[in-house]
């Protein structure tokens, strides 16, 4: 998955090893530690220095409250007109960019990803094709088949903070 492509800008726990795409080596877990705002700033700077402009921060549910607790220069708002209190952070603005925070249930609970979506591209491996199947009564049946892959144009434009605990 995507975690295996983010090989350059990784912040890892002790004994953690980043993936190596060329050698087909998967990431190795390191010692768990607590996510801090300083870690986010560090990986954001690394991405920016490599020419990336990440705009999305993918966060697993277990770490969402930790991100919402980042203080930075934050101000919490209380909208009295509609009796709404905003107790979460939807956008994080840092020294190296503005990041939309995306809750993600499709990643490990110990990883956070800072992604530059402009550096990924959907490629077609096999074009969409309809193949007729056996006719059943008055209905005609088809199999629609296609094959895609996701291309990482520059893995250094994105980054990962790994080996995290809630």
Residue map of PLM features:
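Sequence/fold signature of self-assembling virion shell proteins
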Residues: 1-46, 52-53, 65-166
């Amino acid at each position: 998955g995507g975690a295996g492509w983010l090989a350059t800008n990784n912040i890892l726990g002790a004994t953690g090893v980043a993936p190596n795409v060329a050698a087909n080596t998967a990431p190795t877990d390191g010692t768990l530690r607590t996510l801090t705002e300083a870690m986010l700033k560090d990986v954001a700077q690394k991405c920016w220095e490599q020419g990336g402009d990440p705009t999305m921060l993918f966060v697993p549910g277990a770490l969402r409250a930790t991100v919402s607790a980042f203080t930075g220069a934050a101000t919490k708002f209380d909208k009295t007109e509609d009796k709404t209190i905003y107790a979460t952070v939807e956008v994080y603005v840092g020294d190296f960019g503005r990041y939309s925070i995306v809750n993600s249930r499709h990643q490990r609970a110990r990883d956070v990803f800072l992604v530059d979506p402009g550096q990924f591209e959907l490629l077609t491996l096999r074009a969409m094709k309809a193949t007729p199947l056996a006719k059943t009564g008055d209905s005609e049946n088809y199999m629609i088949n296609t094959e895609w892959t996701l291309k990482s144009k520059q893995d250094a434009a994105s980054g990962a903070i790994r080996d995290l605990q809630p």
